[in-house]
Amino acid sequence: MVCSITKLAQKLISIPSISPKDLGCQDIMIDFLDNLGFEIKKININDTKNFWATRGFGKTLTFAGHTDVVPPGDYKYWNDDPFNPVIKNGLLFGRGSSDMKGALASMLIASERFIKKNPNYEGRLSFLITSDEESSAIDGTKKVIDYLISRKDTIDYCVIGEPCSSSKIGDVIKNGRRGSITANLTIHGIQGHIAYPHLADNPIHKGLPIILKILSIKLDDGNAFFAPTSVNISNIHAGDGINNIIPGSLFVQFNFRFSTETSEKEIKSKFTQILDNNNINYSLNWFFSGNPFITKKGLLIDNITKSIINLNKVKPVLSTDGGTSDGRFIASMNAEIVELGLMNNTIHKSNEYVRISDLEKLAIIYEDIMYRLLT
């Protein structure tokens, strides 16, 4: 017999909600929460669907997540249709099963169980759901947070269902994330025949020593929560593949993942200082993804840790590694934030799956967190 969590997860996975399209996932969630007595506010912007659901009053525990998924890629690498969820040997396969429709199903079932047992709980239980997490993240959680701040609304504790477990549910939880900023640098030269270099200005030759200087930038040593700030090249391009032309420009894209020891301003200053000291013609633009954030030990981490130890017999490791998450937007509300979800070993891969037993384990832990913070 397929349990209610699995059925709900299958229902969500069967919808091809490639970011930022929701295509009906949130309608399923909204109907579910409406039946539990939640007040729902839809905040839809352009192609993005968002909603904010609340039940109760007082200190607010929010469960946050996203209904969008990354594209499945070439179907030939899947054993089954990625949007036709199938169960094999206790595993539920499908795009979004781990990231993060399985966790959404666990959240919903956990809230249903909690409310049935504790209909008059103290405080407020809420959901913040978006369909724009995997792509631009422009019209998603950020806009919902802007709306909540404009209304002077609050979030005290937030559990984000991102898949950060490694080998056992809850063995790794995220209590922060690094900041991210991208530099798009174009070094301009003069195109010419490669046999007459004195009549051209090769931007690759000019750019190579500058690239090495940028890669050697040391911004900080990190701290107890974060590794040192890092810089990596993500894209580089010059020329059109012709072997007798000196290209007219060199494009290099750098990404910085930065700790709380360094600011966006400091990164930009060090970067442009290197460029300006080398007398080159360049153009530069930046894309800022978000600042780092950290939740230090407090009520949320303490209670989540106790839940995981008691219910899954493992002590969680606190981590801030990995990519950015929507926690960077929620952090602006001064909330305590922890990311706790399913396994991350198959996310964004073909044949993504989740163990059905893990859906139930996660729901039990989520329900216990509700009990600890709202009763």
Swiss-Prot record:
Keywords from the named record: Amino-acid biosynthesis, Cobalt, Diaminopimelate biosynthesis, Hydrolase, Lysine biosynthesis, Metal-binding, Zinc
Which pathway does this chain act in?
Answer: Amino-acid biosynthesis; L-lysine biosynthesis via DAP pathway; LL-2,6-diaminopimelate from (S)-tetrahydrodipicolinate (succinylase route): step 3/3
Which Pfam family is one of this chain's hits?
A: Peptidase_M20
**Binding positions (Zn(2+) 2):** D99, E134, H348
Q: Which InterPro entries match?
A: ArgE/DapE_CS (IPR001261), Bact_exopeptidase_dim_dom (IPR036264), DapE_proteobac (IPR005941), Peptidase_M20 (IPR002933), Peptidase_M20_dimer (IPR011650), Peptidase_M20A (IPR050072)
What EC number(s) is this enzyme filed under? Answer: 3.5.1.18
> Which class of enzymes does this protein belong to?
hydrolase
Keyword Zinc recorded: yes
Q: Which co-factor is required?
A: Zn(2+); Co(2+)
Q: Which reaction does it catalyse?
A: N-succinyl-(2S,6S)-2,6-diaminopimelate + H2O = (2S,6S)-2,6-diaminopimelate + succinate
GO BP annotations of the record are: diaminopimelate biosynthetic process; L-arginine biosynthetic process; lysine biosynthetic process via diaminopimelate
Q: Which residues form the active site?
A: D68, E133
Which family is annotated? Answer: Belongs to the peptidase M20A family. DapE subfamily.
| Oligomer and partners | Homodimer.
Q: What does this protein do?
A: Catalyzes the hydrolysis of N-succinyl-L,L-diaminopimelic acid (SDAP), forming succinate and LL-2,6-diaminopimelate (DAP), an intermediate involved in the bacterial biosynthesis of lysine and meso-diaminopimelic acid, an essential component of bacterial cell walls.
The entry's protein name is Succinyl-diaminopimelate desuccinylase
Q: Which organism is it from?
A: Buchnera aphidicola subsp. Schizaphis graminum (strain Sg)
Gene name tied to this protein = dapE
